[in-house]
Structure formats: C-alpha cells, structure tokens
C-alpha cells in the first residue's frame, strides 16, 4: 500500500474518481491473478487498465508480449518510465472500448490472446460485452470486477442474479470465481468487494446454436421485463418473423409452460429454443 502511494506521490498523481481508479496494492493478489492466467512464454497478453504497471511487469516476465492499455495520460507516462526495461511490453494510450484485439494478433502472429485486467466498476458491462464481441480472438480472460457483476456472470437459473450476462457469457465461456478481494487491498479503498473471475473461451460455444445473432436477439427480448413471462416479452418484441403462437408451441415441446419466465430457462434451453426458431 505504501509503495503504491509513494509512486503516485512521486509523480504528483491523484486517483481520478470519474475513471473509477482504485489501484490494487496487494502483491499477493497480483501474483495470484497472473498465475490464474497460466501464461506461456509464447503468448500475448492484453492488460486492461495497466495503472502503475505493477502487475504488468509480472506478466512481462512470463509472456512473449504484453499490450498494456491505459486511458489515463499521466499513468501512461508512468508506465513508459517504469516498464522501459521490458522490451516485450507495448504501452497503449487509449480506451479499451475502442481497442481492436486484432491488433495484438496481427503484430505478433498469434491466433489467440489472453486478457487480464481490473475492470473499472462504472463501465464493467460495456467492457465485458466488448470482450464477448471479440471472443474469437481470446482464449482466456482473468478479470477483477465488482462482486455483484461476478454474481450475474456466475448465476444459476431461478435466481435474481440470473439474466442476460449469465446466458450470453454462459454460452461462449466456462466461467469460474477464483478470488474474493477485500476493499483494503486497494488504494483508495472502493466501497464494494471485488471478485476475480476466470473465463475459458473454447473454439466452439458450450451449446451449439445455429444463429448467433438470433440468440443474442432472443435473450435480450426474453429478459426485457423480468416480471413478465417469456412469452409476453416475446409478444412485446413484435418480431415480424416470429409470432407468439410459434414460441408457445416451442416452449410446450420443450416441457416449459407458457407461464415460464426467462430467468427459469437454462442456457441449454435458450440454445434449443433459438435453434428451433431458426428451423421452424
């Protein structure tokens, strides 16, 4: 903790609240996060929000290449100074939401990358869906996030936390909770507990779907209003190519009644419903 404060003081930097800057200051947690990524010497890592570069250096000692993405210009200057001895680190001043992961693939002739990062709580959902959009370029993601966000990713059907993120990420990745990180591990202390989540993204979805775009569309429509039944939400979606009668018949064929809500349907059932819609 003292070390982090000292670096900030030496560079006359104060954490920027609007960027959600809370610097991880526990070295044991940093080491565990990097170990969870199981970095091999021929792999490329993209780090989200490299901050002061403390965890970046741990990655650089293991990986072939590290792309350290940081939006704060002052921190970029710190990173370039602190990491200048690592010739396998590229410091990128930019917004991760605008970062093209194909850049990391193209420069280093690799097929897949790994992602490590402490996601700012205020933009956790946009970052997660940016990762999901680029899933074909990513093999593993080890991400620290607000506990409530991790709860939604790892939820089971029938619970309040089960929703759109659960189903969409659950189709494409094996997700596991790995660490709980207390507020005292950061400077300044956040008001919430953090969780480190590991995502393993295989070549193919965990459940086969005929049409990815239709799956996204279906899931988002199904959860539009949680208190309504899935059937009513689909009616309100006004799909020209999908009338309520078809949905009702398909749900009945799956053994799910017309009163079922979206949060009661498993990821596998969503995939089956999507495929039935594709072929019916």
Curated annotation (Swiss-Prot):
Catalysed reactions, as listed in the record: adenosine(1518)/adenosine(1519) in 16S rRNA + 4 S-adenosyl-L-methionine = N(6)-dimethyladenosine(1518)/N(6)-dimethyladenosine(1519) in 16S rRNA + 4 S-adenosyl-L-homocysteine + 4 H(+)
One cellular component (GO) term of this entry: cytosol
EC assignment: 2.1.1.182
Keyword set includes Electron transport: no
GO MF annotation list: 16S rRNA (adenine(1518)-N(6)/adenine(1519)-N(6))-dimethyltransferase activity; RNA binding
Keywords: Cytoplasm, Methyltransferase, RNA-binding, rRNA processing, S-adenosyl-L-methionine, Transferase
Residues annotated as binding S-adenosyl-L-methionine: 24, 49, 70, 95, 118
Classification via Pfam families: RrnaAD (PF00398)
Subcellular location: Cytoplasm
Primary role: Specifically dimethylates two adjacent adenosines (A1518 and A1519) in the loop of a conserved hairpin near the 3'-end of 16S rRNA in the 30S particle. May play a critical role in biogenesis of 30S subunits.
Family: Belongs to the class I-like SAM-binding methyltransferase superfamily. rRNA adenine N(6)-methyltransferase family. RsmA subfamily.
HAMAP family: 16SrRNA_methyltr_A
Protein name in UniProt: Ribosomal RNA small subunit methyltransferase A
Species name: Syntrophus aciditrophicus (strain SB)
